[in-house]
Amino acid sequence: LKKILGITGVAIASVALLAACSSKSSKEASKSSGAKETINFATVGTTAPFSYEENGELTGYDVEVAKAVFKDSDKYEVKFQKTEWSSVFTGLDSAKYQMAGNNISYSEERDQKYLFSYPIGTTPAVLTVPKDSNIKKYDDIAGHSTQVVQGTSTATQLTEFNDKHSDKPVELNYTNENITQMLTSLNEGKYDFKIFDAPTVN
């Protein structure tokens, strides 16, 4: 596999640890008893270096930041919940989770429903293709196939690409596979390219 850096037209927003205490979030935890309120923190756990498992424990930048935030709190304790990406926002909406972090990018649509922390970084994207690919630059993806995860910035980006290239759209195959599985599929020639966050694929 090879990576094409600096993709033209990629608009990746600043990554933020999603302080998504959604408007539906329950705040009636037993404060009168003096017990700490549990903050359920959703993360996928397969997107190193942001969120991954090591020795059976969740870690990564987003996870460690959350641990540091709550370390000395006398009101809250954080409990990390591993889940699929497709369940992160539905879980926030239903108050199953009160926070989430998984290299989550900011968007105006998400800002209408969730509270974001200050940005904690920016994430460049890379276009990853097999070594013998004829895709040399971003515009070459027209008419080719890829995998995307619903609700990600990549899915939005490629949908917008197809709107502008309706005569030769990218074939979008939606999946819940993790990064390792998607790289394997790409290497086996099942798909033509994949856009990844650079730190994750590196």
Predicted segments, located by residue:
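Bacterial signal peptide processing site
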Residues: 22-24
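Bilobed "Venus flytrap"/periplasmic-binding protein-like clamshell domains
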Residues: 41, 45-48, 58-72, 124-180, ...
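Bacterial N-terminal signal peptides that target proteins for export
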Residues: 1-8
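Acidic, polar ligand-binding/catalytic clefts
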Residues: 67, 79-140
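C-terminal motif of bacterial Sec signal peptides marking the signal peptidase cleavage site
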Residues: 17-20
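A ligand-binding cleft/hinge motif common to bilobed small-molecule-binding domains
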Residues: 87, 102-112, 157-162, 184-202
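Extracytoplasmic small-molecule ligand-binding "clamshell" domains
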Residues: 31-103, 175
